[in-house]
Amino acid sequence: MGKLHSKPAAVCKRRESPEGDSFAVSAAWARKGIEEWIGRQRCPGSVSGPRQLRLAGTVGRGTRELVGDTSREALGEEDEDDFPLEVALPPEKIDSLGSGDEKRMERLSEPGQASKKQLKFEELQCDVSVEEDSRQEWTFTLYDFDNNGKVTREDITSLLHTIYEVVDSSVNHSPTSSKTLRVKLTVAPDGSQSKRSVLFNHTDLQSTRPRADTKPAEELRGWEKKQRAPLRFQGDSHLEQPDCYHHCVDENIERRNHYLDLAGIENYTSQFGPGSPSVAQKSELPPRISNPTRSRSHEPEAAHIPHRRPQGVDPGSFHLLDTPFAKASELQQRLRGTQDGSKHFVRSPKAQGKNMGMGHGARGARSKPPLVPTTHTVSPSAHLATSPALLPTLAPLGHKKHKHRAKESQASCRGLQGPLAAGGSTVMGREQVRELPAVVVYESQAGQAVQRHEHHHHHEHHHHYHHFYQP
């Protein structure tokens, strides 16, 4: 350390603040305290030449003389014994120091001092503690030199040079009396921190270890808080987290299925092939659907309205079905035929999303008999492969397509009236239908729906033709 602190002043850099000014030292100067510290060295010459600053530094809690009485730091080009520092303290207070570096010091309250005369700065106040009425210490608290909690030897050296310059410029030098000013710098940690060793290497290690230990802990706590806030995990219980996670997943799946049901179940459940649901299951699905397909509970009311008109117009068409059981089975099969049988005539998927209960749907159902003979060649598996939920919505396009075919195929439909009326007695009873399996029931209903569909739509078409096509 003696080698370091015996460097010339030109090697040591002057400590500057971010503003570029010199570092101001806040201290209250008293004549009695300084006289106790000063080694009496008097020189009859003037004090205009280079001055010598004798330094005794206390680093940490152990005292270590940086310069001492033997090793002195030369601040000028001349020999240190020829031109010692002589400071003449003025009898009055001096308020001539106003430095830009005063912001870097903490302002401390100044209690009453036993000394009568002291040097007081403009804005800075420091504590003055009197010990044994013979010594006086000035305590000034500094911020971190490098703003990183580390104090280096170069910082202390430059700080001592700054103290020397500030004191030299702030005191009036009297040519009559010469006194030597001895500055004692003590660098000590705060009382709240742990004890540090005298060496700066140990100080650096101890100052960096608490930060390295506490920083990951604080980051971990902050991360736990961030995790607890959105997910609402309680404490650090790792057993509750998987349960909550699985519960959220199940809830999301249920919510998704609910929205899929609201959007329309026919878009997500395929009704193709032999694995399709039965007629009883299909009758349960449409009540969930809001608009695209009407449920069976609403279809008989809409279907009875056109059915009653041909009964009043053509009462002779139902002469083979006079018994109440036959009429009931005929109406039941006819209603199912209007829904299931209409799917055999759909060839274009352009008119989806329209309702069956509208008048266009009724007209489309009436104008479809020309394609009836082609449905006899379709296999029952092809009947199963058509979706009843989508096909009734395609009806409105049919009556526009088949208007021109209605007149051409009217004779063929009338030719089929006799065999279809004769085959009307082959309607199965309700008991026989219930005994069959689901797929067989669907096939038999599809076959009966074709026959009843032809017969039913023939008469409706006849009624429709007389009312709408006659000029």
Curated annotation (Swiss-Prot):
Tissue: Highly expressed in lung. Also expressed in brain, heart, kidney, liver, skin, stomach and testis. Within the testis expression is found in the seminiferous epithelium and round and elongating spermatids.
Residues that, per the record, bind Ca(2+): D144, D146, N148, K150, D155
Location in the cell: Cell membrane; Cytoplasm
Listed Basic residues bias regions: 453-471
Alphabetically ordered keywords of this record: Calcium, Cell membrane, Cytoplasm, Developmental protein, Differentiation, Lipoprotein, Membrane, Metal-binding, Myristate, Spermatogenesis, Wnt signaling pathway
Annotated Basic and acidic residues bias: 62-75
Gene Ontology molecular functions: calcium ion binding; PDZ domain binding
Outcome of swapping D146V: Impairs inhibition of the Wnt signaling pathway
Induction, as annotated: Expression is induced by activation of the Wnt signaling pathway.
Annotated ranges, domain EF-hand: 131-166
InterPro entries per the UniProt record, alphabetical: EF-hand-dom_pair, EF_Hand_1_Ca_BS, EF_hand_dom, Nkd-like
Gene3D superfamilies for this protein: EF-hand
Biological process annotations from GO: axis elongation; cell differentiation; convergent extension; negative regulation of canonical Wnt signaling pathway; negative regulation of Wnt signaling pathway; positive regulation of MAPK cascade; positive regulation of non-canonical Wnt signaling pathway; positive regulation of protein catabolic process
Region listing for Disordered, in residue ranges: 1-23, 41-82, 273-314, 337-382, 448-471
Lipid sites, type N-myristoyl glycine: G2
Role played: Cell autonomous antagonist of the canonical Wnt signaling pathway. May activate a second Wnt signaling pathway that controls planar cell polarity. Required for spermatogenesis.
Name recorded for this polypeptide: Protein naked cuticle homolog 1
Organism, scientific name: Mus musculus (Mouse)
Encoding gene (name): Nkd1
